Structure formats: structure tokens, C-alpha cells
Amino acid sequence: MKLQVLVLVLLMSWFGVLSWVQAEFFTSIGHMTDLIYAEKDLVQSLKEYILVEEAKLAKIKSWASKMEALTSRSAADPEGYLAHPVNAYKLVKRLNTDWPALGDLVLQDASAGFVANLSVQRQFFPTDEDESGAARALMRLQDTYKLDPDTISRGELPGTKYQAMLSVDDCFGLGRSAYNEGDYYHTVLWMEQVLKQLDAGEEATVTKSLVLDYLSYAVFQLGDLHRAVELTRRLLSLDPSHERAGGNLRYFERLLEEERGKSLSNQTDAGLATQENLYERPTDYLPERDVYESLCRGEGVKLTPRRQKKLFCRYHHGNRVPQLLIAPFKEEDEWDSPHIVRYYDVMSDEEIERIKEIAKPKLARATVRDPKTGVLTVASYRVSKSSWLEEDDDPVVARVNRRMQHITGLTVKTAELLQVANYGMGGQYEPHFDFSRSDDEDAFKRLGTGNRVATFLNYMSDVEAGGATVFPDLGAAIWPKKGTAVFWYNLLRSGEGDYRTRHAACPVLVGCKWVSNKWFHERGQEFLRPCGTTEVD
């Protein structure tokens, strides 16, 4: 009964917490924290179940010990034992009453409460999509920050607070996720890591023959026919009855025979070409991939000494706003052209926590606008959850909005709502423009406020590693610092887009990244930021 009450309490409390959470937990660390508490309560429920089972087992053990002692005496001299009428009565009673009662005790199912709890909460657990998304996130971090599988498996990441290692089965899960998505490059890397840990003697449920089955086909898909044959033969030495491996080996060997039939020169050239490109990370659609990722690693930043001399710090009072004359903000130049500045102590810790508190229940997978259709959709290159806050939601929202207006000298009347974003595992937003380009579907037409003239980005958390805001065309990288904000203009004074402001949010390697954005629009800024005398002013 006690267990049933506990289960009911657990169900009521966590049903309320998780019922509003959508799938795609991996896209928001904020939502994943709820899973920690859900798992903690499941452990408590499981411990209660174990206590009940142990108490039941203790009774059964006590009964068994007592019966063993009794039957050893009675079986030694059955007639003499039964000569005593009390013994005869007790034997009948035991077999008619006590043993059936013991049977009922054994048949009692103490797991019902725990199973009921697990079944209800399971509706809100991560899905296969979450697991594959989390696997992709780890591989994204692996590629962006040039981490080898062994480093990730040992959990040797910069800025980590807790030790975390990947088991053999964990590594196999990563390799299998890559395989299921046709990503044979990462399949090979992680299946090789599985073999390495198996050879080191680690325990696992996965078998070496299963790993070789995946690995041999993956290297074949990457064009390494000789190694595919070698691995398949190794698989068959472990499991001679493996039908698919036998068929694959015959197929691979036939392809090798066909290769040998080619001219020696062609074969040599082809072999060299294959080896040169073997196991290379596949190319994708993003032209500035190398530049973007090197900036994320802190490499390739083009902040030369000459440029650095142009950067200064100062106290900023806006356009002599009375509030800022009394308490100006510290302003630091991050880049000279286009001018990107950072402001310090823009939001207090209390304001940040309050905004996160009211934003969290509204978080939903962040979307992007399809440039062809103008329709909002989710995309693999933007991994985060976001919500939009109105001033009516809480006084702190109105207060922060006014502060951004004072700092920038721009009106927030035509600005978008305050967007709060929380990045998940490997959370990122690949290179993009904040403004709508002339060849795009007019993304802001329905707002009637013109294009996005400026971006005000608040950092609401520190990030232990990764998570920089980078500008690939500039070679600039800006690192998150809690309570600070960066600001830049997306449009030139002529109203044309400043294409140098193409930027990205790097994947979060370690930590939890919270930001909030305010996008100012053109309407209402005509006299606050008037046109210049030239097109590029």
C-alpha cells in the first residue's frame, strides 16, 4: 500500500512537469534537466520495490530454513515423528494452510506499482528521434572540435565538472546510429572504438562478430574493398555460420577479382585515389564549413595587432539618456568594421533566472524560414529550443526591453518580441543572416515593420567550452559571458543588407547555453538612425 501511494504521488508530480514537454529533448539542456529529476524519482520508486521484494524474500528464506531443519528431523524417523499427535496435526496444518499461504506470498507481484509508474512516465521519455539526435550531436562535436572517439569515450573534454565515460555498448550505439543514417564515416570511427575497448577486456552485451558485421560493410561503402574482405574473414572465423557474412565475402572477393582484371596502371591509380580519400569526413552543403569550425575552435581569428589598436573600451550613455547618464554601461569594441560591441552587466542574475523561469514552459524547437517557400520549419543546422516573451508575461521583460532601447538608442515599439533560446547537446545555429535578403521570400512582410536593422544578443549563461558566436567572413569570434550582450547593425544606413554580418552559434561542447535576442526593425528608426550620405555609411 505504501508503494502504491508513493507511485501515485510520483505520477501526479511528474505528469505535471513533463506533460508540456515536446519530444526532441536533445535540442534543449533546459528540458533535459527535467529528465534528471524524473529518473531520480524512478530510482526511488525502484528502491521501494526492491525493499518490498527483499522483505518478501527474507520471509521465504526464514520459512525455508525452518522447514529444512524440521524436515531433516522428521525424515530421519517418519513414524517416530508422527507418533506424537502434535507433530501429526502440525504436518496436516502446514500442508493445508501454511504452504498454500507461502505460495500466495511468492505469487504476490510487488512490481505492479513500479511498472505502472514507469509505464506512465515512459510516455514523456526521450524517443528514438532523441537518441539519434543526441548521437548526431556528439558526432557534430567530434567533427567541429576535432575530437577522436577515444577522447570522447574517456570523457576527457575541457571544462567538464563530472567524469563521464562511454561503455562499449554506448560506443556501439553511436556507431549504429551513424550506420542507420548512412553515415559510414562515423560508423567506422565508432565501431573501431568498440573493437578497441573490447580488445582491452571491457565487458559488454554486444558481440565482436556483430561489430565486425557493421564495420566490414561500412568500410566497403567507403571504398576500402581489401579491408572489407579482411574484416569479413575475421567475422567468419568467429562465426562460421554467419550467412550474410558468407554472401558478402563471396561478393567482395568477386569485386577484387574484377579489379585484378584491370590494367596495372589503372588499378594503381584507382588504388591511390581511393586511399587518399579514404575515411575522410563527407563534404556537405556549407561552403564555409572549415572557416566556421576553425573559428569555433578559436583558430583563424583575424584580430591582427593593427585591428586591435582600433578597439577601445568606454562608458556608454546612449544618446545621453538620463538613466544612463547616472549609470552608464561599460562598452567594449569586439570588432571595428562592421562595428560589433559588447556591453557588460546588462542583466542581473536575478533577472536572468526569472526570464529563464517564464521562458522554459514555452520552449519549442527553434525553426528557420525556408528561403523558397517562406514557411517556418525545423532544420538540422539549428539545434535549440526557443520561446517568445511579451511584456505582459512579467515586469522583468518590460524592464529589459527598456534597457535595450536606452542602450541602442533605437525604439523597441517595432522590434520583435524578446526571444529566449536554450541550446541542447551540441546546440548550434550554422552560418546565417539575421536580415531578409532581396532574393528571399520577404520573411517580415506580415509584420509591416521592414527588415531587421539590428541584433541585440544577451548571454544569459557562461559556457564551459564551445558556444562562441562567430562571423566567418570577418574571422571574428565572440565568446559567451553571462550578463553581457553584443550588438551590431545588420543593415547599412542605406537599408541594404551588410553581408559581412553572416554569423553562427558554434556547437556547445560543454555547458548549458542560454541567450535572448531582440531584433530591431527599420520602421520607427528613421530619425534615430537616419540614412548616410553614401550607400555604405
Curated annotation (Swiss-Prot):
- Tell me the residue numbers annotated for binding Fe cation: 432, 434, 503
Q: Name one Pfam family in it.
A: TPR_P4H
Under which EC number(s) is this enzyme classified?
1.14.11.2
Query: Which residues are reported to be glycosylated?
Result: 117, 266
Keywords (A to Z) from UniProt:
Dioxygenase, Endoplasmic reticulum, Glycoprotein, Iron, Metal-binding, Oxidoreductase, Signal, TPR repeat, Vitamin C
Q: Where is the signal peptide?
A: 1-23
Top EC group:
oxidoreductase
Residue spans of the TPR repeats: 209-242
Reactions catalysed: L-prolyl-[collagen] + 2-oxoglutarate + O2 = trans-4-hydroxy-L-prolyl-[collagen] + succinate + CO2
What top-level branch of life does the organism fall under?
Eukaryota
N6-succinyllysine-modified residues are 482
Q: Could you tell me which InterPro entries the record lists for this protein?
A: Oxoglu/Fe-dep_dioxygenase_dom, P4HA-like, Pro_4_hyd_alph, Pro_4_hyd_alph_FE2OG_OXY, Pro_4_hyd_alph_N, TPR-like_helical_dom_sf, TPR_rpt
What compartments host this protein? Endoplasmic reticulum lumen
Detail which positions bind 2-oxoglutarate: 513
Q: Which GO terms describe its cellular component?
A: endoplasmic reticulum lumen; procollagen-proline 4-dioxygenase complex
UniProt key word Signal? yes
Q: What is the regulation of this protein's activity?
A: Inhibited by poly(L-proline) only at very high concentrations.
Oxidoreductase is among the record's keywords: yes
User: In terms of one coarse class, where is the protein primarily found?
Assistant: endoplasmic reticulum
Organs and tissues of expression = Expressed at least in brain, heart and lung.
Named cofactor requirement(s): Fe(2+); L-ascorbate
Family that this chain belongs to:
Belongs to the P4HA family.
* Function noted in UniProt: Catalyzes the post-translational formation of 4-hydroxyproline in -Xaa-Pro-Gly- sequences in collagens and other proteins.
**Assembly behavior:** Heterotetramer of two alpha-2 chains and two beta chains (P4HB) (the beta chain is the multi-functional PDI), where P4HB plays the role of a structural subunit; this tetramer catalyzes the formation of 4-hydroxyproline in collagen.
Q: What is this protein's record name?
A: Prolyl 4-hydroxylase subunit alpha-2
Task: Report the source organism.
Answer: Mus musculus (Mouse)
